[in-house]
Amino acid sequence: MKIILFCGAFDMVHNAHIAMAKQAMKLVNADKLIFLPSNFKFFKAINKNDNLEYEKTKLTPGHHRIAMLKIATKNLVNIEVSDYELKQINKSYTINTIEHFKQIYGSEHEYYFIMGSDNLERFKQWKDWERILKEVKIICFKRGDVCVKKSCPQKSCECESFNFFEHEILLVNDFNYNISSTEIKKRHNLTSGIDPAVLDYINEHGLYALWLLEKHLISYDNFNNLEKKVARINHCRRVAQMCVDLMNVYDKKLIDQAYCAGIYHDILKCLDEQESVAYFNEHKSELNIGDDFISWRILHSYLGAHLLQTQYGFKNQLILNAIRRHTRPFDFIKDYSELTTLDKILYCADKLEPNRREEIDQINIDYYRKLVFEDLDKAFIEVYQYQQRQRK
């Protein structure tokens, strides 16, 4: 039996990962391929002094990466997803993973290991790299057009293998997927390069939200002070956490949706009056809002939900409605009973998150921060009434 081990962050899994798996299996006529998301980022520089960048470079929780891999591979034959490396308490090293699967399936089989040519260049930095070469055959996917052996003219390499410390490395040259998870997150172009069902999962759970918030809250913002730009993102993060904490009390099944609504609720808060009205006028027929809206300052809730749905493929109406209603919760509903638990939680979290201040944002704020965990309806009504009085 021929078994291929495919290790990596898979954060997020994209079409190139799936194409690599298929091509590797075809190359060696493999019987089984196992995806193994890792529990640690090796060789990645992390700036812990920049909180936003640090949060962006953290690995997405393993259960989400496993779920996305299972979605992306659900129709593929002889391809499995394993959480072996995720379960390791310490850093999971390739040599340990190889030994584990040889114990499971037996050492008499042929084992292969997929890597990119960028990793091959620093392979001697890997733990027990010489043992790895003895235990498995390497399938190397070439990145770029430069010959790994440094012997072919650039852009014309056709090497199928080469000798690496007396071990044959199988080379894949005709791989034409120029995709990376980081580039997808930077552009937040999630409508191409990944399985549509994976996109739905990402949106449903609010994954990679900081990249999208940064794109809109910073790129479109005219503040010169980076602190003020980042403050908006941090407000969204605090609201998201409070939404999660509240939903943990009121409906644990909706915790992910609570996070998603909280993290994205102010995605277009950066738009000024001219930009908000221009967006409104351009999409008026889709927004279903009359021209008599109370103030341009409340438009960001409707515009944000519209942006998420039309540009980024969000489908969950529970999340989208909560975002729409977080400034004017009673617009477009007939009575209080139509408001969802998520609507009320997002509204309260936005007004009561830890950085909101007494008198300026909400009177008796500590009282309401406690009350909202005990009686959501009472807290919502009283906070809403106070906010309405403040606007008069």
From Swiss-Prot:
Domain HD: start-end pairs: 232-355
Disulfide bonds: none
InterPro entries to which the protein is assigned, alphabetical: Cyt_trans-like, HD/PDEase_dom, HD_domain, NadD/NMNAT, Rossmann-like_a/b/a_fold, YqeK
Protein residues bound to Fe cation: 235, 265-266, 350
Alphabetical UniProt keywords: ATP-binding, Hydrolase, Iron, Metal-binding, Multifunctional enzyme, NAD, Nucleotide-binding, Nucleotidyltransferase, Pyridine nucleotide biosynthesis, Transferase
Molecular functions (GO terms): ATP binding; bis(5'-nucleosyl)-tetraphosphatase (symmetrical) activity; metal ion binding; nicotinate-nucleotide adenylyltransferase activity
UniProt: ADP binding residues: 235, 266-269, 300, 326-327, 350, 356
Associated pathway: Cofactor biosynthesis; NAD(+) biosynthesis; deamido-NAD(+) from nicotinate D-ribonucleotide: step 1/1
Residue span of region Ap4A hydrolase: 230-392
GO biological process, one term: NAD biosynthetic process
Catalysed reactions listed for this entry: nicotinate beta-D-ribonucleotide + ATP + H(+) = deamido-NAD(+) + diphosphate; P(1),P(4)-bis(5'-adenosyl) tetraphosphate + H2O = 2 ADP + 2 H(+)
EC number(s) given by UniProt: 2.7.7.18, 3.6.1.41
Region NaMN adenylyltransferase, residue ranges: 1-210
Functional description taken from the UniProt entry: Catalyzes the reversible adenylation of nicotinate mononucleotide (NaMN) to nicotinic acid adenine dinucleotide (NaAD). Hydrolyzes diadenosine 5',5'''-P1,P4-tetraphosphate (Ap4A) to yield ADP.
Protein family: In the N-terminal section; belongs to the NadD family. In the C-terminal section; belongs to the Ap4A hydrolase YqeK family.
Stated name of the protein: Probable nicotinate-nucleotide adenylyltransferase/Ap4A hydrolase
Annotated organism of origin: Ureaplasma parvum serovar 3 (strain ATCC 700970)
